[in-house]
Amino acid sequence: MSKKARFGVVLVVLAACSGFLFPTLQWYFLTDAQTRQRALSSREQIKEYAVQSAERDLADLTRLARAGSDEDISARYAPLVAAARQNLSYSGRPAPSRWTAAALVSAFPVKSEQGFVLYARPLMEQTYREAVLKMKRRQAQAVKLGLDLSGGTSVVIKADLSEVTKGVPDAERAAIRSEAMALVLSTLENRINRFGLSEPVIRRQGEDRVYVEIPGLTDRDRVHSIVMGRGVLAFHLVDDDATQKLLDHYRNNPQGTFDAAHQLHDLSLVPEHTSVLGVYRKDSYGLDVRDGFLVVKKEPALEGRHIRDATVSSGRANEPLVLFDLDHEGARIFSELTTKEIGRRLAIVSDGKIRSAPAIREPITAGSGSISGFSAEEAQNLKTALRSAWLNVALEIENQQVVGASMGEESIRQGTRALVWGLCAVLLFMLVWYQEAGVNACVAQLLNLYIMFGVLSAFNLTLTLSSIAGMILTIGMAVDANVVVFERIREELALGKSRGAAVCSGFERAFWAIMDSNVTTFIAALFLSVLGTGPIKGFAYSLAIGVVSSVFTALFVSRLMFDYGTEVLHKKTVRIGWRIARV
């Protein structure tokens, strides 16, 4: 490879690593602790923060407007200023030269202060929400700290797939198992997010296991209750008359109908064998929000266990349809139900929340049906809910480990100290023993570490104590490649070759020795990553990444620096060890 091509490869690799590392550097070093804590909070907490911040800002703004303040408004009202400019442009009015509180409020097409607040609050809330969610996305791209460094709980969960595959043909079992595990992952994620836990790590491990990390949570009993809870889905008939009566009562008495938990204060408002359930939808935070209520029969008309499949399709007008199939018993029950209850609504209830309440338009006797009236996203959510009823897999906790936050902080200090001291010791030895050539080795070592962190960030891997151990080992192993190259160059110089010829021959002679040792190490790391679990995997990943990056820096970066000294600086000698070799 030519020197220009080699230089281009090095630049491309370093530029790529810079791009991969940017979110990590920005998250850990350029973001203040308060912003990081806010981004790591649950979506419920983010929503509360955005709503409260928007209400506080609008209260300050309206107070200044009432007082007739002549001061320029704060930059945090920039979204409102942009909307105000747009409103003034549409109405043909000029924008003011200075934006005061009164000028901003008067730019909106509302007649009262309350109307302005209702108009402006979504804009301000969106600004705060997007700022936090942007940091949350950035954190997801940064190198994450494992539980041994940050504290929390890790759980290995085994899914019992025997019931799911019972009676399924052998040719279809693999697909059913895969789909069941995908739904297990989705169910666990929804369940953990519902409890307001921040940034959980949920990933499949093997064929029938799931690995879960919950940072900051060290209560074993709470973890067990969150993970092991099982969802329930069923179809309930809606009592439309009772719903209308309760709705009329609610309109006349909105504060006294429900308590803070959305439970009725007066149970006599609905018939005895019914219950009031909320209708829920996903908001802009990805959270379930209550959007009305329905009175439904307590006894389910059809249990979710009878659902055998659910898919999303398109109707004649290209509108999303949710198609579902029932087993033999479910088909019989559903046929009788839909024949008898034409015109009534059938609520689909998942975990006590109504996801949909379609009307029964005609008898469904074929054991399959369709539900319409959704957006594409809502149809996908309903499909997932229906399939989770069919693939309701029993879960069992196989292993659970808890690491305290103080232990995590101490691990960070110890791991960082070991990495820094190990690197410094290696760099010092190379400088003292190999002198000028040692400078090249030191630069290569620093770039080696830089590339390793870049690759960790690129693949969204987690940094653990075992990963740090792998890095420390890699630093020591990377020296070996440089030592082999330096010794070969010294041998060539002893034969009387010039600096350029000795460097070229030295790298050529050292190439296969370096490749042989590193390829065998890489193969060992590959087997450890495939067969190992937990800390062994972390060690194997960092070792494999380090092997590749150390070979790259030894053969590309170090060679480039030698060539630079020869051809650009016109050096005639090279100092390797305690001798100076001359032409």
From Swiss-Prot:
Q: What are its GO biological-process terms?
A: intracellular protein transmembrane transport; protein targeting; protein transport by the Sec complex
Species this chain originates from = Treponema pallidum (strain Nichols)
Q: Which GO terms describe its molecular function?
A: protein-transporting ATPase activity
Span of the signal peptide: none
Q: Pfam families, from UniProt? A: SecD_1st, SecD_SecF_C, SecDF_P1_head
Q: Which NCBIfam families match?
A: 2A0604s01, secD
Q: Which domain of life is it from?
A: Bacteria
How does it associate, per the subunit comment? Answer: Forms a complex with SecF. Part of the essential Sec protein translocation apparatus which comprises SecA, SecYEG and auxiliary proteins SecDF. Other proteins may also be involved.
Membrane spanning residue stretches: 7-27, 419-439, 446-468, 469-489, 511-531, 538-558
Describe its function: Part of the Sec protein translocase complex. Interacts with the SecYEG preprotein conducting channel. SecDF uses the proton motive force (PMF) to complete protein translocation after the ATP-dependent function of SecA.
The gene name reads secD
Keywords, sorted A to Z? Cell inner membrane, Cell membrane, Membrane, Protein transport, Translocation, Transmembrane, Transmembrane helix, Transport
For whether the record's keyword set contains Protein transport, the answer is: yes
**InterPro entries for the chain:** SecD, SecD/SecF_arch_bac, SecD_1st, SecD_SecF_C, SecD_SecF_C_bact, SecDF_P1_head
Q: Which family does it belong to?
A: Belongs to the SecD/SecF family. SecD subfamily.
Q: How does it sit in the membrane?
A: Multi-pass membrane protein
One GO CC term, this protein: plasma membrane
Keyword Transmembrane helix tagged: yes
- This chain belongs to the protein called Protein translocase subunit SecD
Q: Where is the protein localized? A: Cell inner membrane
